[in-house]
């Protein structure tokens, strides 16, 4: 699937989930497609943020076809499908972990005083094999959200304040800028890892520059 088709498919999925969230009968605020800057100026494109009396719900939408396979702690999940009678599998980053990084960016803006929940929605209802409460199809999303209770519900004023804080901190980046920022961070990370490996190969501590010593068959910094 080329980038334009993938982008269009993603937008279709996000619009579908937004239409279900708009049906929420409780007092709420819904923010779709918000970009925030997190740690190290990394941009986070968040599909949906639903703010209501029982908390803040950060929702990642995946409009993937094929059978979805994965566990909560896996780094990657897999979607498996057939092409011309042959099974094909493609891995993708665990969306729960992806969404939890978005939550960190949100907490950077609003603090830690409010309950925040992570949900992942597969619009094709093809994640039945993942037995997690916060992974579902769009039809059951609001039902699951309504099951969550908290000791002290958010007031109307708090809901509106949270919404305004998030909107005031929105980073106005194009999709291309967002992708480029991610690429820059990944490039810096790989470059840093390369520098560390090069230092270790020279038996030099990458942190302090001291010569590494061999202790119990391992290289260790004398400091």
Please state what every model-predicted region is:
Residues 1-44, 51-56, 62-70, 81-223:
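Surface-exposed interaction regions that form or flank ligand-binding interfaces
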Residues 76-78:
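A short, glycine/acidic-enriched catalytic loop
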């Amino acid at each position: 699937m080329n980038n334009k088709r993938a982008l269009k498919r993603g937008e279709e999925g996000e619009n579908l989930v937004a239409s279900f969230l708009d049906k929420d009968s409780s007092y709420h605020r819904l923010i779709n497609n918000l970009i925030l800057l997190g740690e190290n100026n990394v941009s986070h494109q968040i599909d949906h943020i639903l703010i209501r009396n029982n908390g803040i719900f950060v929702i990642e939408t995946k409009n993937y076809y094929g059978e979805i396979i994965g566990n909560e702690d896996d780094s990657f999940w897999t979607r498996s499908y057939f092409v011309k009678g042959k099974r094909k599998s493609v891995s993708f980053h665990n969306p729960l972990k992806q969404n939890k990084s978005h939550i960190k960016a949100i907490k950077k803006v609003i603090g830690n005083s409010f309950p925040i929940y992570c949900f992942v929605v597969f619009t094709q209802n093809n994640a039945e094999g993942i037995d997690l409460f916060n992974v579902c199809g769009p039809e059951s999303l609001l039902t699951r959200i309504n099951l969550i209770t908290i000791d002290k519900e958010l007031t109307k004023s708090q809901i509106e304040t949270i919404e305004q804080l998030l909107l005031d901190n929105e980073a106005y980046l194009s999709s291309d800028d967002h992708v480029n920022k991610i690429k820059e961070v990944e490039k810096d990370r790989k470059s840093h890892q390369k520098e560390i490996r090069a230092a270790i190969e020279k038996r030099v501590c990458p942190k302090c520059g001291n010569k590494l010593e061999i202790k119990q068959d391992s290289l260790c910094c004398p400091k």
